[in-house]
Amino acid sequence: MVAAIIAGAAVAAAAYAGKYGIEAWQAFKLRPVRPRMRKFYEGGFQATMNRREAALILGVRESVAAEKVKEAHRRVMVANHPDAGGSHYLASKINEAKDMMLGKTKNSGSAF
């Protein structure tokens, strides 16, 4: 007799848990979708780097102070340095972007 009561209580508890689980899942699916990551630039590199592309690479505005360019260059290079497993190509593009933003380039294009 006691076993039947315990079994009935267990079945009722499982039914209520299932009901609330389904309701929670439906509420979760109905919530508005929020982007989990920032939207990144989907295009590739241009043949000749311009100021806009340099600003996109460094993550700064086109009309930014030299100090901010240097800070952004350091931040991006730490994340993409070849000695830390980054790409030599990306490192060269990052350096080219810094030179472009600081006005140290003759706009001759990339070495690659």
UniProtKB/Swiss-Prot annotation:
Keywords: Membrane, Mitochondrion, Mitochondrion inner membrane, Transmembrane, Transmembrane helix. GO terms for cellular component: mitochondrial inner membrane. The chain crosses the membrane at residues 7-25. It is found in: Mitochondrion; Mitochondrion inner membrane. The keyword Mitochondrion applies. InterPro entries: J_dom_sf (IPR036869). It is a single-pass membrane protein. Residues 53-112 form the J domain. Disulfide bonds: none annotated. Gene3D superfamilies: DnaJ domain. SUPFAM superfamilies: Chaperone J-domain. Probable component of the PAM complex at least composed of a mitochondrial HSP70 protein, TIMM44 and TIMM14. The complex interacts with the TIMM23 component of the TIM17:23 complex. Component of the PAM complex, a complex required for the translocation of transit peptide-containing proteins from the inner membrane into the mitochondrial matrix in an ATP-dependent manner. Belongs to the TIM14 family. This is Mitochondrial import inner membrane translocase subunit TIM14-2. It comes from Arabidopsis thaliana (Mouse-ear cress). The lineage of its organism: Eukaryota, Viridiplantae, Streptophyta, Embryophyta, Tracheophyta. The gene is TIM14-2.
